[in-house]
Amino acid sequence: MTKESLEKATFAGGCFWCMVKPFDTQPGIEKVVSGYTGGHTVNPTYKEVCSGTTGHTEAIQITFDPAVFPYEKLVEVYWQQTDPTDAAGQFVDRGDSYRPVIFYHNEEQKEIAEKSKAALDASGRFKKPIVTEIAKAETFYPAEEYHQDFYKKEKAHYEGYQVASGRAAFIDANWKG
């Protein structure tokens, strides 16, 4: 994997703690960073983003090798971590800072995301329409260090939150098997 061959992908799917592990464990992923994007405040803090005044959403930014794990597969993994029918947040996390968004970095990513969204909508997997936003990537601000790799640093807290938030049950009911 050379630096020149690496690309970025940015996804918002509710609490960023829950979004890192599914990508971090895939081949061809160099790093996954938790952070904030899509708003108007420069270098926001977690507290500011949670206040709902920054316009930012919690997101992850992935550095990946598309020759090993193409963007199409990243989008597929993304859908399987979210409730794509809920634009007002994800699971127990409500509000703009938890809205689901696929942020594209180029026209190819935009086209892949739009086609994937249309295919998921047409599949009939969900009774409600797919409302996940697809938007141009903006400045990404890494979150505070204690949020990075949360699933590794705070394993019990992370696993408990996956269950308590309703995310684990939703994924099992809608994406497994």
Swiss-Prot record:
UniProt keyword Mitochondrion, yes or no: no
Single annotated GO MF: L-methionine:thioredoxin-disulfide S-oxidoreductase activity
Catalytic reaction annotation: L-methionyl-[protein] + [thioredoxin]-disulfide + H2O = L-methionyl-(S)-S-oxide-[protein] + [thioredoxin]-dithiol; [thioredoxin]-disulfide + L-methionine + H2O = L-methionine (S)-S-oxide + [thioredoxin]-dithiol
InterPro entries to which the protein is assigned, alphabetical: Met_Sox_Rdtase_MsrA_dom, Met_Sox_Rdtase_MsrA_sf
EC number(s) reported in the record: 1.8.4.11
Alphabetized Pfam families for the sequence: PMSR
One GO-annotated biological process of the protein: protein modification process
Record: active site: C15
UniProt keyword list: Oxidoreductase
Top EC group: oxidoreductase
Keyword Acetylation on entry: no
Top-rank lineage group of the source organism: Bacteria
Family to which the UniProt record says this protein belongs: Belongs to the MsrA Met sulfoxide reductase family.
Record function comment: Has an important function as a repair enzyme for proteins that have been inactivated by oxidation. Catalyzes the reversible oxidation-reduction of methionine sulfoxide in proteins to methionine.
HAMAP family, sorted: MsrA
Protein name: Peptide methionine sulfoxide reductase MsrA
The gene coding this protein: msrA
